[in-house]
Swiss-Prot record:
Any Pfam family matching the protein: TFIIB
Start and end residues, zinc fingers (TFIIB-type): 36-68
GO MF, one example: DNA-binding transcription factor activity
Protein name, per record: Transcription initiation factor IIB
Keyword Repeat listed: yes
CDD domains documented for this protein: CYCLIN_TFIIB_archaea_like_rpt1, CYCLIN_TFIIB_archaea_like_rpt2
Family to which this protein belongs: Belongs to the TFIIB family.
InterPro entries in the cross-refs: Cyclin-like_dom, Cyclin-like_sf, TFIIB, TFIIB_arc, TFIIB_CS, TFIIB_cyclin, Znf_TFIIB
Domain of life of the source: Archaea
One cellular component (GO) term of this entry: transcription preinitiation complex
Annotated Zn(2+) binding sites: 41, 44, 60, 63
């Protein structure tokens, strides 16, 4: 019983630290927002601003204008030359993240049986430490909501890893799922379905598009359920998502076909011209992107067959034939097959 009381006290301390940490994060975010007001170059209007830490300057990457100088380096005062050295000298934990149910603000008892000085724990105290560690794992997920989040976020991470999605997409998906939980949109729906729909919405928000078929392949629910749940949560959460642009698919498809940068640039230009003439309206973005890449590969001397392009893009050869003929005719592109 004494051990349980200790663990309850630890949990109360953990919750107090968690609240203090969240308040600190809010203050830091507010400060960062105030500091980043000047996020547009006054000379050329570009948003591509880069911090040059060697010269302590904020430089526009487009025109080279120095917007700020002698800014404060908020990094650590120590230097490290490899990963092990960095881990030894670091005095803080990982940053806050929405992809963990407790946002990464909780603590845990280390699995190595050593004290704070690095000395081995005596055999007499190891049994007690084992019990404390077991109870610590149990109380870390204390209620049904946290259990729901823990399972859903692990499912999100699994699907994102299978699709090779970057960190910002995972964070956005976790935020969308948390909002759905807060508004009680999970009731009557499967956790996997809502998680997959949140991931699909995050991909669209971050301009890293994935099709419903691709999401369905790595999830445990059907494409139909993902689409239905996605429409529901986007309506209830008020997500304002623009239609997916075919241009967003070009880099991934070109990489899958091992095409050079010139072919990719030409495909993007073809799609821009098609967009200006409204040739992409009402058509699937993957099919239009695949057709533009097919045309570009022929013009660039790196011909890929319609079957190869169709396999990478996840569309049929008939779709590519119809779209590429339409693009070639409307844009006056002469193709020699």
């Amino acid at each position: 019983m004494a051990e349980v009381e200790k663990l309850k006290q630890l949990q109360l301390q953990r919750e107090a630290l968690k609240k203090r940490g969240e308040q600190k994060v809010k203050e830091t975010e507010k400060k960062r927002t105030e500091e980043s007001v000047q996020s547009v170059c006054p000379e050329c209007g570009s948003r591509q601003l880069v911090h040059d830490y060697e010269r302590a300057e904020l430089v526009c990457q487009n025109c080279g204008l120095v917007l700020d100088e002698e800014f404060i380096d908020r990094g650590p005062e120590w230097r490290a030359f490899d990963h092990d050295q960095r881990m030894k000298r670091s005095r803080v934990g990982a940053p806050m993240t929405f992809t963990i149910h407790d946002k990464g603000l909780s603590t845990m008892i280390d699995w190595r049986n050593r004290d704070s000085y690095g000395r081995a724990i005596s055999s007499k105290n190891r049994a007690q430490l084992y019990r404390l560690r077991k109870w610590q794992r149990r109380i870390r997920v204390s209620n049904a909501t946290e259990r729901n989040l823990a399972f859903a976020l692990s499912e999100l991470d699994r699907m994102a890893s299978a699709l090779g999605l970057p960190r910002n997409v995972r964070e956005t998906a976790a935020v969308v799922y948390r909002d759905a939980v807060d508004k009680n949109l999970i009731r009557g729906r499967s956790i996997e379905g809502v998680a997959a729909a949140a991931l699909y919405a995050a991909c669209r928000q971050c301009s890293v598009p994935r099709t419903l078929d691709e999401i369905a392949e790595v999830s445990r629910v059907s494409r139909k359920e993902i689409g239905r749940t996605y429409r529901f949560i986007s309506r209830e959460l008020g997500l304002k998502l623009l239609p997916t642009s075919p241009i967003d698919y070009v880099p991934r498809f070109c990489s899958g076909l091992n095409l050079k940068g010139e072919v990719q640039s030409r495909a993007v230009e073809i799609l821009r011209q098609a967009g200006e003439r409204e040739l992409t309206s009402g058509r699937g973005p993957t099919g239009v992107a695949a057709a533009a890449i097919y045309i570009s590969s022929i013009l660039g001397g790196e011909r890929r067959t319609q079957r190869e392009v169709a396999e990478v893009a996840g569309v049929t050869e008939v779709t590519i034939r119809n779209r590429y003929k339409e693009l070639a005719e409307k844009l006056d592109i002469e193709i020699i097959l």
